[in-house]
């Protein structure tokens, strides 16, 4: 012992150590490691070895020494493994009975060395595992023994460092049963705080791997939650490293997909809500700290992180049912939604005058309310919660009142938009004047896109023509709509167009109002002509808020897309041509919807006295109506054709000045035969599949629209033009006769089409 101490003192001299960096030479390390005696059990030898390992552990606190120690020629890792084998000949099973106090102190220093060598050092972890993987078995056994708590603490620390961000070592410790051992240790009565601190760090690192989580179930989670509550009640949350590490572990585990559903079924949300409900007492424990010692960016209670976890769980469509279903005992007090609403609406606690921590406590509460409000907004997407929420509409309307908090406003708009799913609900919400309230808010935050998008979507739901007959938008609301039609975001543009459509459906006089409103017509024409840049990406960092349940009020384009997916079998050549067009063009939904609105204006005779506006409308609608005509959806093609017919009535020269009009119309007529080919093919298929019948019904609907399209183009355009000698000549110059004959001879061309073509051919050849 004295000899070793003397050697250590000598090695501390300048010959072996850099005094500035505390870096020891390879020679010094080698001299010390050679003194390890792994072939004797004498007390003096054990104590000498303990001193050697303690010294090496101290040296390895310096980063530069770790490489020198672990790769020393005498191989300290191999010597250590041999030492374990020699001192524990009967294996780890008899550790509690066979190990002396002196040996436990030695093992403790060995663990300390291994922990220091692998602290933030992945190559050293790999080196140990490659050379002597069995050494992990001994370290694991030191945790499971109950006789020496100091050894438990240092072995836990070693496991924490060895397993940090190292999958293969995490998995090896898991196979040795360490995950379960650590849970038992953490939850055992009588485990000291010092051991617990290290045990939770080891556990935290081990379960950072889904493969090591497979044996953890709700029972284990519940036990850990119990320990967390004990720790919080004793020490609070701030600067409670055990609680912080345990929260980190529970957060990691609660995001395990296989574990999530199990723990939610067993009532995990109830435990989380309880943590929030009990957090006021933990906030008060911050009073034991001096103001200057408190880091302002740290949470002072567990409630903010808990509420954030609750929000993440609610963000999963499959898990929201656990928020509105009563807990297993059926007790109303355990209804998660009711308790969340109570948290959201509760006034902030009153703090004593002169409480210097009052602001910190209030901010902590505010974080919780923000997360819970976001969670409630997500829950409003579910049909099953609407009847509950609509009973207390004012608490949701109040989210929009007297606030500068943009996130609070977005949540309020989202909830109100989702509540507006039925006529009674809309009437009740409108009794609070929410349309104007939202319109004013949108004007107040013009550049905050989530507020604009969800505001437009909410008002769209509240102004459905079936609910709000006779509705007339205010000047503020019109300004909001016009402003958003210019925003470079397709989602917002489409929402603005949906509102214009609603206004017209509510009252035809709104056509005149829109026409007269400054810049309104121009903004609509710009959208229809594709002059406004658009992106599908929301530029805001609050993308998760753009989740209004638009599926409840389906736009016609969604239906078209579904049909398009269902009807995939088409003529090969036509398919190739259509696909080429689709790939070369941008997303056309906004252009289509804006053009459909232009048709409403052209088709209204009461607007004829607005000559300047109508002239502008006619001149700038030619290309949009051709775009609509060339869309992939028969119903839109019909509207495009009708729009062109109206344009021809106002100014046929605008139409005729388009060089390719004959070719464009014939091409659309050619494509209009496809639904008839599809119908013939599907009707010949014998099947009892009910989905096949739906498919046939969809194709039949397309056939009806195609028939109408053929009639509009052939009767109202081609035939009428064939009666005009000057136009007839231009048509012939564009090879119209040959084109129509080819079209007439197509297979599966319906009789109505061939009859109309024949009528036109007769007129053209007179």
Curated annotation (Swiss-Prot):
The keyword Iron does not apply. One of its GO terms (molecular function) is small GTPase binding. Residues 561-585 are annotated as: Disordered. Signal peptide: none annotated. InterPro entries: ARM-like, ARM-type_fold, RAP1GDS1. Keywords: Repeat. Coiled coil: none annotated. GO terms for cellular component: cytosol. ARM repeats lie at residues 82-119, 167-208, 423-464, 465-537, 610-649. Binds to small GTPases racE, racC but not rab21. Binds preferentially to GDP-bound racE. PANTHER family: RAP1 GTPASE-GDP DISSOCIATION STIMULATOR 1. Part of a signaling pathway that initiates the aggregation and leads to the formation of aggregation centers or streams. Not essential for cytokinesis, pinocytosis or phagocytosis. Not essential for development, except in starvation-induced aggregation. Belongs to the RAP1GDS1 family. This is Darlin.
């Amino acid at each position: 012992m004295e000899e070793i101490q003397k050697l250590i003192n000598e090695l501390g001299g300048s010959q072996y150590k850099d005094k500035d960096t505390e870096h020891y030479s390879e020679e010094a390390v080698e001299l010390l490691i050679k003194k390890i005696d792994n072939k004797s059990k004498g007390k003096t030898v054990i104590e000498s070895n303990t001193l050697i390992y303690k010294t090496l552990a101290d040296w390895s606190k310096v980063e530069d020494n770790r490489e020198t120690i672990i790769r020393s020629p005498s191989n300290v890792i191999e010597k250590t493994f041999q030492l374990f084998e020699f001192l524990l000949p009967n294996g780890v099973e008899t550790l509690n009975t066979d190990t002396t106090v002196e040996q436990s102190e030695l093992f403790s220093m060995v663990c300390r060395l291994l922990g220091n060598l692998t602290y933030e050092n992945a190559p050293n972890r790999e080196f140990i595992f490659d050379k002597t993987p069995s050494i992990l078995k001994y370290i694991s056994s030191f945790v499971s023994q109950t006789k020496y708590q100091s050894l438990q603490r240092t072995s836990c620390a070693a496991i924490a460092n060895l397993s940090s961000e190292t999958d293969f070592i995490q998995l090896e410790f898991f196979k040795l049963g360490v995950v379960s051992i650590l849970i038992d240790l953490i939850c055992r009565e009588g485990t000291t705080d010092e051991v617990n601190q290290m045990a939770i760090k080891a556990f935290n690192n081990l379960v950072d791997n889904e493969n090591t989580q497979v044996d953890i179930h709700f029972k284990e989670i519940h036990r850990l939650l119990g320990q967390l509550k004990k720790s919080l009640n004793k020490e609070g949350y701030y600067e409670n490293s055990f609680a912080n590490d345990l929260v980190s572990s529970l957060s990691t585990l609660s995001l395990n997909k296989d574990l999530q559903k199990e723990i939610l079924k067993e009532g995990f949300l109830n435990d989380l809500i309880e943590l929030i409900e009990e957090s006021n007492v933990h906030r008060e424990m911050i009073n034991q700290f001096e103001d200057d010692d408190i880091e302002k960016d740290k949470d002072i209670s567990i409630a903010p992180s808990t509420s954030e976890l609750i929000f993440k769980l609610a963000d999963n469509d499959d898990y929201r049912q656990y928020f509105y279903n009563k807990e297993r005992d059926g007790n109303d007090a355990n209804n998660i939604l009711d308790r969340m609403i109570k948290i959201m609406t509760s006034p902030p606690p009153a703090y004593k005058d002169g409480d210097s921590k009052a602001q910190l406590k209030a901010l902590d509460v505010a974080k919780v309310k923000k997360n819970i409000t976001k969670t409630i907004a997500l829950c409003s997407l579910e049909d099953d919660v609407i009847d509950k929420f609509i009973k207390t509409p004012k608490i949701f309307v109040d989210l929009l009142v007297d606030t500068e908090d943009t996130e609070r406003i977005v949540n309020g708009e989202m909830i109100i938009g989702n509540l507006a799913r039925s006529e009674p609900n809309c009437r009740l919400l409108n009794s609070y004047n929410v349309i104007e309230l939202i319109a004013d808010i949108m004007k107040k935050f013009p550049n905050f896109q989530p507020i604009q998008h969800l505001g437009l979507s909410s008002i769209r739901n509240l102004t459905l023509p079936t609910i709000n007959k006779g509705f007339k938008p205010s000047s503020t609301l019109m300004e909001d709509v016009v402003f958003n039609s210019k925003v470079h975001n397709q989602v917002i543009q489409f929402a603005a167009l949906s509102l214009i459509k609603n206004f017209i459906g509510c009252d035809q006089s709104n056509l005149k109002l829109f026409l007269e409103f400054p810049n309104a017509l121009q903004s609509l024409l710009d959208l229809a002509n594709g002059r406004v840049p658009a992106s599908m990406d929301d530029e805001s960092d609050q993308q998760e808020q753009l989740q209004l349940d638009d599926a409840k009020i389906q736009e016609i384009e969604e239906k078209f897309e579904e049909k398009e997916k269902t009807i995939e079998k088409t003529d090969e050549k036509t398919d190739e041509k259509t696909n080429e067009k689709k790939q070369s063009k941008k997303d056309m939904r906004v252009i289509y919807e804006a053009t459909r609105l232009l048709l409403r204006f052209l088709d209204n005779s009461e607007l004829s006295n607005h000559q300047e506006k109508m002239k502008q409308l006619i001149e700038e609608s030619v290309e949009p109506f051709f775009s609509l005509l060339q869309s992939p959806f028969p119903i839109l093609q019909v509207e495009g054709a009708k729009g062109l017919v109206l344009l021809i009535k106002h100014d046929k020269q605008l139409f005729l000045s388009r060089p390719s009009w004959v070719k464009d119309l014939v091409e659309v007529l050619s494509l209009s035969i496809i639904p008839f080919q599809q119908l013939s093919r599907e009707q010949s298929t014998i099947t009892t599949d009910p989905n096949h019948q739906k498919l046939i019904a969809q194709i039949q609907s397309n056939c009806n629209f195609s028939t109408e399209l053929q009639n509009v183009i052939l009767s109202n355009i081609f035939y009428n033009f064939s009666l005009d000698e000057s136009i007839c000549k231009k048509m012939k110059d564009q090879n119209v006769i040959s084109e129509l004959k080819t079209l007439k001879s197509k297979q599966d061309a319906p009789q109505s089409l061939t009859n109309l073509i024949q009528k036109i051919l007769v007129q053209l050849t007179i």
